[in-house]
């Protein structure tokens, strides 16, 4: 038989090579189309990796920490990667007992330097911060490698578990009963201008409110005292006009049934936290309000 005729002859379905091609094709379909339905959510998350000094990785060694990039104002290092736990040491709404617990954990020189840069910055706090996302995995070392989810769910490596967003209990805030199932998560920084130093209050809010202007109207009513200090500063010190009363940034969303209280254990110390299970990262920009 002519070789060209043999080449044009249809392949036998029982041929081993043909079976291999069929199997590979089916596997590609699973990896591309059907994969988002395997765990009842789309796990095609956007991730990034950051190198962090060992002294800044304490509670951050466990998944779920909110990671923030801070401008130092120096040539080296220009940026530091800190978490909400370290930022809570300088939050005015954190209780003295929680602050002492956090200070007893973050005793390394890198953590102390980060706290000094937080205090000495010339601008309002949110002008020097950029929220990056949530920590998923950590490779510990002298310089630790943190894998951060910037958009999507906090899946583990095998995509079989969704990690929770961990918030210190003193920094958690809610304004209404969880009537609806969907809860939007916001980061709120509010400034208190009473006294010689401007003190920031840092909160993580869960709310069913999605409309921006409605959220701002509620925030103005809840933080009436801080707004009065803002107006008083503008009247008494017109040359030192503050920029705003506070800022709001969207972090993502979760379900009302997935909000629980828990403990975070590190070096035999227990930190009371609020755990947002099945949290999905969906970052927005800092938006100021007065």
UniProtKB/Swiss-Prot annotation:
Record's subcellular location: Virion; Host nucleus
Keyword Amino-acid biosynthesis: no
Gene Ontology CC entries for this record: host cell nucleus; viral capsid
GO biological process, one term: viral capsid assembly
Annotated organism of origin: Human cytomegalovirus (strain AD169) (HHV-5)
InterPro entries in the record: Herpes_1
Keywords of this entry: Capsid protein, Host nucleus, Virion
Function recorded in the entry: Structural component of the T=16 icosahedral capsid. The capsid is composed of pentamers and hexamers of major capsid protein/MCP, which are linked together by heterotrimers called triplexes. These triplexes are formed by a single molecule of triplex protein 1/TRX1 and two copies of triplex protein 2/TRX2. Additionally, TRX1 is required for efficient transport of TRX2 to the nucleus, which is the site of capsid assembly.
Annotated protein name in UniProt: Triplex capsid protein 1
Top-rank taxon, per record: Viruses
UniProt-recorded Gene Ontology molecular function terms: DNA binding
HAMAP family attached to this UniProt entry: HSV_TRX1
Family indicated by similarity: Belongs to the herpesviridae TRX1 protein family.
Pfam families linked to this entry: Herpes_VP19C (PF03327)
Assembly: Interacts with TRX2, MCP and capsid vertex component 2/CVC2.
């Amino acid at each position: 038989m002519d070789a060209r005729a043999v080449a044009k002859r249809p392949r036998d379905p029982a041929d081993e090579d043909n079976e291999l091609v069929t199997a590979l094709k089916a596997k590609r379909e699973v990896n591309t189309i059907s994969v988002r339905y395997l765990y009842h959510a789309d796990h095609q998350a956007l991730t990034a990796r950051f190198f962090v000094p060992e002294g800044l990785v304490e509670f951050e060694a466990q998944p779920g920490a909110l990671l923030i990039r801070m401008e130092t104002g120096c040539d080296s290092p220009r940026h530091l990667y800190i978490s909400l736990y370290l930022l809570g040491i300088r939050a005015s709404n954190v209780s003295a007992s929680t602050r002492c617990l956090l200070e007893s954990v973050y005793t390394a020189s890198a953590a102390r330097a980060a706290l000094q840069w937080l205090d000495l910055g010339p601008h309002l706090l949110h002008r020097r911060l950029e929220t990056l996302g949530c920590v998923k995995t950590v490779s510990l070392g002298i310089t630790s490698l943190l894998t951060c989810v910037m958009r999507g769910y906090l899946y583990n490596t095998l995509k079989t578990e969704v990690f929770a967003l961990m918030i210190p209990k003193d920094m958690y805030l809610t304004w209404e009963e969880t009537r609806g199932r969907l809860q939007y998560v916001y980061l709120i920084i509010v400034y208190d201008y009473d006294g010689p130093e401007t003190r920031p209050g840092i909160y993580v809010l869960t709310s069913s409110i999605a409309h921006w202007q409605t959220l701002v109207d509620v925030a103005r009513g809840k933080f009436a005292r801080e707004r009065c200090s803002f107006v008083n500063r503008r009247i008494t010190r017109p040359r030192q006009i503050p920029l705003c009363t506070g800022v709001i940034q969207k972090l993502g969303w979760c379900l009302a049934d997935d909000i629980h209280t828990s403990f975070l254990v590190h070096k035999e110390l227990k930190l009371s936290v609020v755990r947002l299970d099945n949290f999905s990262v969906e970052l927005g920009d800092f938006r100021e309000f007065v």
